[in-house]
């Protein structure tokens, strides 16, 4: 999954809502007090796997976007603060919320004066127009293009106004403007399918100075960001840390040791060790944090090829046959709740319909549905090669064997797995995925991950390749609504998709968990941003 695909548990613990890492941090009363803070220092973050891209037009992994939360400047943002204020969409580069005209279809943003890129150039409306240009450029294949498919036109007006006109009213448009795809970029940023490389010029409080693929990354201060001056001061960033260093490659068990020995500051750990860490350090005190997040993990079935294409009964059989209890256990202590629905428990609009078994496999129902529908009985499953990936794949292999399907497991680095499954025509039948919200709206799960009209050649997040015309129309209707009617429509749509079409099999709505060194202070987390890099400090 891209932001938001979630990384595997061992991949990173910094992401929020891009493809998902299942072990993120949480914060609560009892965390390290801000009075323990000191400005400066280096924060070392360990990850089993690398960023997908460092180009905001292409990146969509949770931990990549978490890094970009400290480096990018968007028109609007969700404040880097815990509690209700962190879920309230607010102006960032914009002077205020945009002026709305043309029956709710035209938005005019006025850009604050004073923001500068890390190379010293001024941020203007043209920098946001360039971000739109790149997201919509077909040669780039940006995942951001699908979030602009209802844009009729966009333009700059003078130096500091940016205007967007939609084809139809879209209640979630402003929330989309908080996404990293649409952050300010220099007007000469090239169109390249491979993405730009470090150093990445950006207009947030930090910028990416170095990126050594599969090895390390370095993020340092933007010298032109002045916390105590406007327009910067109103955003409330602390920016305590001088530089962030990412260390890529160590396995989860090694990461834990690195944090315990003071060789790193934010680390993952084997899922089986979560209980031990909680017992040793307590929960939400200083070093081991647990927090609810809007993240879902699920088993994807490829609806475009092989044994699951036009085979809804076999897809339903899989949802009955998998062992959600065992799968959730592989995520470890306090990992989350079992689920059989696509909207996470904490997503507005969620309603519990109890469609499939949350206890163990229902082989009787699964076999009835599978009978006569297994075709050649062969399936290829992709998974990642760390943490919960291998044991969950083996569980699926065993469960599906009981209904007449032989599963061949192929393991990859998480980034490679995602690149493969996101390529249309890739020869897989099953893949293990996780997704976290970009913004708190049910369309960010259902429309983003299941609207088949958004499928492109590569960089897909709809890796089930589900494309149902009737469901697409219902998504459009739900997305045109607002308020309680919108949430009710999406709740029923969730039920009907899972009950009647079963393009994938959800199994856990997760918590965030994170382990830190004893020198980390001011730790904060939100379900939108993930770990708050602009607020964290060293003690």
Predicted regions mapped to residue ranges:
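Extracytoplasmic/peripheral linker and loop segments enriched in polar/acidic and small residues
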Residues: 36, 316, 328, 406-419, ...
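Surface-exposed binding/hinge segments that line
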Residues: 38, 110, 144-189, 194, ...
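N-terminal lobe/hinge region of extracytoplasmic solute-binding protein
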Residues: 46-102, 133, 201
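Periplasmic-binding protein-like
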Residues: 55, 308-348, 391-392, 497-506
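Gly/Pro-rich hinge or "lid" segments in bacterial periplasmic/extracellular proteins
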Residues: 79-84, 178-243
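Structural transition elements
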Residues: 206-207, 336-371, 386-391
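Ligand-site clamp/hinge motif
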Residues: 225-277, 406
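Long beta-strand-rich cores associated with HINT superfamily self-processing modules
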Residues: 514-539
């Amino acid at each position: 999954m891209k932001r938001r695909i979630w990384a595997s548990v061992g991949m990173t613990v910094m992401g929020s809502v891009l493809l998902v890492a299942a072990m993120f941090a949480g914060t609560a009363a009892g965390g390290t007090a801000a009075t323990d803070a000191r400005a400066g220092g280096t924060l070392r973050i360990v990850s089993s796997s690398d960023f997908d891209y460092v180009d905001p037009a292409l990146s969509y992994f949770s931990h990549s976007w978490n890094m970009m939360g400290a480096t990018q400047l968007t028109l609007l943002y969700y404040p880097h603060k815990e509690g209700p204020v962190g879920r309230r969409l607010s102006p960032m580069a914009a002077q205020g919320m945009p002026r709305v005209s043309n029956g709710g279809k035209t938005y005019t943003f006025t850009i604050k004066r004073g923001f500068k890129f890390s190379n010293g150039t001024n941020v203007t409306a043209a920098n946001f127009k360039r971000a739109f240009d790149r997201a919509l450029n077909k040669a780039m294949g940006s995942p951001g293009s699908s979030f602009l498919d209802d844009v009729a036109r966009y333009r700059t007006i003078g130096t500091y106004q940016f205007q967007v006109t939609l084809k139809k009213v879209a209640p979630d448009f402003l929330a989309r403007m908080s996404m990293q795809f649409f952050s300010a970029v220099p007007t000469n940023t090239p169109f390249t399918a491979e993405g730009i490389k470090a150093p990445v010029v950006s207009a947030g409080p930090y910028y990416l100075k170095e990126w050594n693929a599969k090895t390390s990354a370095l993020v340092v201060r933007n010298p032109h960001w002045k916390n105590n001056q406007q327009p910067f001061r109103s955003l409330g960033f602390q920016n305590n840390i001088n530089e962030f260093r990412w260390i890529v490659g160590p396995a989860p068990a090694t990461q834990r040791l690195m944090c315990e020995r003071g060789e790193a500051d934010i680390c993952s750990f084997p899922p089986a060790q979560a209980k031990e860490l909680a017992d040793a350090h307590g929960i939400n005190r200083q070093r081991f944090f647990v927090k609810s997040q809007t993240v879902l993990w699920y088993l994807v079935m490829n609806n475009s090829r092989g044994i699951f294409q036009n085979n809804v009964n076999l897809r339903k059989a899989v949802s009955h046959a998998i062992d959600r209890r065992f799968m959730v256990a592989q995520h470890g202590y306090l990992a989350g709740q079992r689920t059989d629905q696509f909207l996470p428990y904490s997503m507005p609009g969620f309603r519990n319909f109890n469609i499939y078994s949350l206890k163990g496999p229902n082989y009787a129902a699964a076999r009835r549905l599978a009978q006569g529908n297994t075709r050649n009985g062969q399936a290829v499953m992709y998974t990642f090669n760390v943490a919960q990936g291998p044991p969950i794949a083996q569980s699926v292999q065993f469960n599906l064997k009981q209904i007449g399907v032989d599963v061949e497991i192929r393991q990859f680095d998480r980034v490679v797995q995602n690149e493969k499954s996101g390529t249309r025509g890739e020869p897989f039948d099953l893949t293990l995925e996780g997704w976290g919200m970009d913004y708190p709206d049910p369309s960010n799960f259902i429309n983003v991950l299941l609207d088949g009209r958004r499928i492109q050649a590569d960089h897909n997040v709809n890796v089930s390749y589900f494309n149902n015309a009737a469901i697409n129309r219902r998504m459009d209707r739900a997305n045109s609504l607002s308020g309680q009617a919108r949430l009710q429509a999406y709740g029923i749509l969730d039920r009907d998709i899972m009950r009647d079409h079963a393009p994938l099999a959800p199994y856990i709505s997760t918590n965030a968990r994170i382990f830190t060194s004893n020198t980390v202070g001011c730790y904060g987390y939100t379900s939108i941003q993930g770990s708050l890099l602009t607020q964290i400090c060293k003690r």
